[in-house]
Amino acid sequence: FQAEDGIRDRSPSRGLGDVYKRQDLIKNSVSSTFTSNVLTGLGSFGSLYDLKPLLNEYDNPVMVQSIDGVGTKTIIARKMKKYDTIGIDLLSAAANDILVMGAKPLTFLDYIANDKLDPKIIKEIVSGMVKACRDTGVSLVGGETAEMPDTYLPGEHDLVGIITGIVEKDKIITGEKIRRGNVLLGLPSNGLHTNGYSFARKLFFDVGGYDVSDHPKELEDSVGNTLLMPHINYTKHVLETLNAGIELKGIVHVTGGGLLENIPRILPKGHGVEINKDAWPSLPVFDLMKSIGNIEEAEMFRSFNMGIGMVFIAERDDISDIRKVLNGISPVYLMGSVVNGNKNVIIK
């Protein structure tokens, strides 16, 4: 057809294409996460995943799906000009959310939106996802990028991930088996993970007057590197414990709302928990933020994970076995117990 004079579409999305297809290095890197179950390569309209091989391992398989984002941690990445860890955060945050049901993560999809596409930054972000997917045994089966200058401010990014997993129906962990006398076992975090960043930025940068490059004596590293510590992925912790035949009555991923708001999500009616806050070591980043803002302890526990990234609820007799399974993987802190209550969390 011969072009005619008139208005033409010059929007950023037109002709942008898929960044994965345009960069062979990224394409090959992403493909390296594929298991034999993945039937389509990158660039297809959809991703095909063969379920038949899984049917031999499950009597009644149930799909578990979740969606999550990195939130304003991307602002720290932008300040640091360091984007290779927020892809790890994205996969870990999503995987941990389905692990609490006992599910094994299988596939992952990502969505990256920004004001203006920078292939170098996208490559860094995806490299983190690829590393996390390889470490977790998850196939990164597809992704979407969006360039929207009318929506995002210069330099802004938004990351969203969708994960799919599988669990045997009669082994789904719901928390309904939790009983008085069960114990709470804490798995340590390494920092904020992906929650509480708006509050943390206000404390460090607005109230404390710090820059990302500053290195307060209270921290082992700079403010920026401390805040960018990647979200721990607890896939190995959960699956190895379950594969050892140990029954976990409940699992909590400690995200926004901290221990105070996440533990009640899985407690049956008539149950609460008591937690000994001295049962695990405090992290310097939380101590410093508390000091900067003169923040009450209850508010800290409601805003941050306070050093515990995941909680197992189990029988007291299983403590030793769980510690044996996780020896060399993670410390396990006996942090409290289940008591009579109204889905309340008492921290002593």
How would you describe each model-predicted region?
Residues 1-16, 20:
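Single conserved hydrophobic/aromatic residue that forms the stacking wall/gate
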Residues 8, 121-139, 152-159, 211, ...:
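Glycine-/charge-enriched secondary-structure boundary and capping motifs
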Residues 11, 68, 181, 253, ...:
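Residue-level signature of catalytic and energy-coupling elements of molecular machines
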Residues 23, 123-126, 197:
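Hydrophobic face of alpha-helices
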Residues 28-190:
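Glycine-rich phosphate/pyrophosphate-binding loop regions near the starts of catalytic domains
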Residues 110, 154, 193, 200-203, ...:
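Active-site-proximal loop/short-helix segments
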Residues 182-221:
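Acidic, glycine-rich loop-and-beta core segments that form the ion-binding/anion-interacting portion
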